[in-house]
Amino acid sequence: MSSNELQHLTDAVAHQMSLVFGEGANLDPATPAGLHRRYSFMFHYRIRLPDGIIKSIIVKIPRDAWMKTLHEAISSDHIRGIITTEFEILNAIADAVEGEPLLCAIRPLAILPEFNAVVMDNVQMRLLKTSLSRFSPTWVNSEDWKQFEGPLELAGKLLRVIHSRFATTQQESLESLRVLENPAESLDALGRHDRSSNALLHPLIDLYESVKSVRVPLAGLHNDYHLGNVFVTPEGKVGTLDPNWTASGCVYVDLACIISYPQTRRVQVLTQGLRFPSSLREPYETALLRGYFTGAQFSYPVLYFYCATAALEKWLYIEDLLRELPRAGSWAASRWVRHYFHGLIRQYLEQGLKASASNRQLDDREHLAPLSCS
């Protein structure tokens, strides 16, 4: 990033903040601290408000993974659309959580369209994924779990509030949503290089056949709702970051993303499932589902179908990353990853089929409970 680009950005931030906070609001003259993430450029500024209080803000400029320079990000029409949507969605989420004492949201202060940037408060927070490091593979401290369980349940509640805010009146069957096409094609493609992947296709189809007539609610989706994008403040309030927004989709997509996260994050894959204790899997799911459904009926077979497809998507994502390694290393790592995901996806499919066989789902004629904030 050139010094001229940074200065132009700083000038724009200073001007916008004087409009937001009034004349006399001044940026700290020190150069802003930059933090470059895989999908964003971020800059930390400090503002002295007219009353003398120092306020910390973040300027975020999204980028695609291939974008190496700030110029590429700020000149992209694609990124301009993303930042406009994010600004609107974050404001709508902030409106939705008002009145919820244990939920919070980061309301954007301003948008800088000429820089494809959004300006936000720098909120003190801890990402929920950091809590996973507290749990030993062989022993779980009950106090550590209790401190994690409360925010986890609130994460489920927050997702419900978001879905309720962006719910549609539609309910569609899984068959009409054509949810089998992509995972079936993915398994077929994987099977060309590894025949054992074909063994997952039949149970996937069997589970799909058992749930294809179940009708599910549609809503706007966060589409990246996992413990790395859910935070807790020092006051114990829970909020979310970085929506990868989809205007309408099955709510189980977001649920499966966060439920499968401890099982599909890279450190768990590399340790072949040892990092997240298997004893925590059921209470982890239960806390999230309790927060989201608050006692309402839902379909376990549908949930596990989506968990299986979420795990499959993560498998494909990691395989793409491995292709960047030297060929010998890529081949060995791919076998390691394949072994892990075979087992995980099979578990989800078997759980779904078992739940289906025991009627642990809604009758085909029933709908899921309407989306409404409790």
Regions found by a protein language model. Give the residues of each.
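Active-site activation/catalytic loop segments of kinase-like enzymes and analogous catalytic loops
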Residues: Y252-A296, A310-R327
